[in-house]
Amino acid sequence: MSLDKGTKEEITKKFQLHEKDTGSADVQIAILTEHITELKEHLKRSPKDQNSRLALLKLVGQRRKLLEYLNSTDTERYKNLISRLNLRK
C-alpha cells in the first residue's frame, strides 16, 4: 500500500518550500496524509486486515509528531498546512 512515484512527485511539487525541497515537514506531512487516506480506503474494503490497521496507526502517530514539531517551530506554516490538507484542528 505505498504511493507510486508520480503521486509522491505531484505532492512534493505542491507542498515544497523551494525548488529542491523534498524533505521538509510540510512535504512529509502531505505524503503521510495521502498514504493515510489510501490506507483508510483499503481498510473499508478489508476490515479484518490487522497489519494495515497497525500501519495506519503508526502513520497517524508519525504525522501527529511532525504536526506538533511544525506547530512549535512555525505556527503560521502549520495553520496554512492544516487548511490546505483539510485536517481538523
From Swiss-Prot:
Signal peptide boundaries: none
PROSITE patterns referenced in this protein's UniProt entry, alphabetically: RIBOSOMAL_S15 (PS00362)
InterPro entries in the cross-refs: Ribosomal_uS15, Ribosomal_uS15_bac-type, uS15_NS1_RNA-bd_sf
Recorded GO MF terms: rRNA binding; structural constituent of ribosome
Gene Ontology cellular component annotations, sorted alphabetically: cytosolic small ribosomal subunit
Classification via Pfam families: Ribosomal_S15
GO annotation terms (biological process): translation
Keywords (A to Z) from UniProt: Ribonucleoprotein, Ribosomal protein, RNA-binding, rRNA-binding
Keyword Ribosomal protein carried by entry: yes
Annotated NCBIfam families: S15_bact (TIGR00952)
Family: Belongs to the universal ribosomal protein uS15 family.
Function as written in the Swiss-Prot or TrEMBL entry: One of the primary rRNA binding proteins, it binds directly to 16S rRNA where it helps nucleate assembly of the platform of the 30S subunit by binding and bridging several RNA helices of the 16S rRNA. Forms an intersubunit bridge (bridge B4) with the 23S rRNA of the 50S subunit in the ribosome.
Subunit structure comment from the entry: Part of the 30S ribosomal subunit. Forms a bridge to the 50S subunit in the 70S ribosome, contacting the 23S rRNA.
Name of the protein described by the UniProt record: Small ribosomal subunit protein uS15
Lineage start: Bacteria, Pseudomonadati, Chlamydiota, Chlamydiia, Chlamydiales
